[in-house]
Amino acid sequence: MNLLCDHMLGSLATWLRIFGYDTFYPNEMMNDKDILQVARNEKRLLLSRDHALLLQAKKLLIPILEIQTTDLTEQLQLILQKIPPNETLFLTRCTLCNTLLHLVPKEELKNKIPEKIYQTQDTFWTCSTCKKYYWMGTHYHHMKKRINTLRNNHLS
């Protein structure tokens, strides 16, 4: 299922991407009308805390999920409960722009990443849209730990 987080849910959008959900997050220039248009045109489930936006979406028959808490962990647990994730998609999307990541040969990154990272890591991914590079460093391990914690809480 494709998702759309409104402006108030930026951290949630990032984490949903980490969990592999196709998650649109609007840029700062987009207004409510633009957000609703994307949700409708791309058949996305609108996630929002904004009651007025949710009401407009309902009138347009756009599927919605109201997020009632500001706590990120609770938000993620709600989504995991309502829309179970596909574990094969974990850590496959760019956290910045939502594009699917691609494996890139280590040799192509020789002068594009810090030397220490190049020497200590073997597997790299890149985003073809924003050109960000990813590898299994400390951020990766922290994300995996949080994924496992949330997943285990969801299953219990």
Can you annotate each of these PLM segments?
Residues 1-89:
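Long, charged N-terminal interaction/targeting segments
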Residues 87-91, 120-123:
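Short metal-coordination and nucleic-acid-contact micro-motifs, chiefly zinc-binding Cys/His arrays
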Residues 90, 128, 152-156:
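Surface-exposed, charge/polar-rich loops and edge strands
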Residues 94-97, 127-130:
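Short cysteine-rich clusters marking metal-coordination/redox-active sites
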Residues 99-105, 135:
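Short functional micro-motifs and their immediate structural scaffolds
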Residues 106-112, 139-149:
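Short cysteine/histidine-rich zinc-coordinating motifs and their immediately flanking basic loops
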Residues 111-124:
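Short linker/helix segments within small regulatory modules
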